Amino acid sequence: MSAPNPKAFPLADEKLSQQILDVVQQAANLRQLKKGANEATKTLNRGISEFIIMAADCEPIEILLHLPLLCEDKNVPYVFVPSRVALGRACGVSRPVIAASITTNDASAIKNQIYAVKDKIETLLI
């Protein structure tokens, strides 16, 4: 596999990527996940996004580089994971997914896990 694109910052390490993908999988089961760059953009604009996950191996990467700018405007943490195929599998679809958004739900069963991962992503951004 080639080196990840240098524009894909901050890139999660293997351990954090696994935690993120686990939370993504649980959020997909609880209908708390939006898949794709367009739907992720919509959640940011509506203010219902907890954090954004993007694939670092997206080609061309420019098709999702509007998301970090929007995230910074809306004060939402974001992170890149190494593989779009792994992100697609975690989202529960058979196709690669280049971006996903975990949405807000205060009554969620995985609220604590979402906040734990969100804190780790925020420390990457510092």
UniProtKB/Swiss-Prot annotation:
Primary location class: nucleus
Stored InterPro entries: eL8/uL1-like (IPR050257), H/ACA_rnp_Nhp2-like (IPR002415), Ribosomal_eL30-like_sf (IPR029064), Ribosomal_eL8-like_CS (IPR004037), Ribosomal_eL8/eL30/eS12/Gad45 (IPR004038), Ribosomal_eL8/Nhp2 (IPR018492)
Localization in the cell: Nucleus, Nucleolus
Any single GO CC term annotated in Swiss-Prot or TrEMBL for this entry: box C/D methylation guide snoRNP complex
Keyword list, A-Z: mRNA processing, mRNA splicing, Nucleus, Ribonucleoprotein, Ribosome biogenesis, RNA-binding, rRNA processing, Spliceosome
Top-level taxonomic group: Eukaryota
Molecular function in Gene Ontology: U3 snoRNA binding; U4 snRNA binding
Any one biological process term the GO annotation gives: mRNA splicing, via spliceosome
One Pfam family named in its UniProt record: Ribosomal_L7Ae
Chain coiled-coil ranges: none
Subunit organization: Component of the U3 snoRNP particle. Binds to the C'/D and B/C motifs in U3 snoRNA. Component of the 25S U4/U6.U5 tri-snRNP particle, a subcomplex of the spliceosome. Binds to the 5' stem-loop of U4 snRNA.
General function of this protein: Common component of the spliceosome and rRNA processing machinery. In association with the spliceosomal U4/U6.U5 tri-snRNP particle, required for splicing of pre-mRNA. In association with box C/D snoRNPs, required for processing of pre-ribosomal RNA (rRNA) and site-specific 2'-O-methylation of substrate RNAs. Essential for the accumulation and stability of U4 snRNA, U6 snRNA, and box C/D snoRNAs.
Family designation: Belongs to the eukaryotic ribosomal protein eL8 family.
Entry protein name: 13 kDa ribonucleoprotein-associated protein
Taxonomic classification: Eukaryota, Fungi, Dikarya, Ascomycota, Saccharomycotina
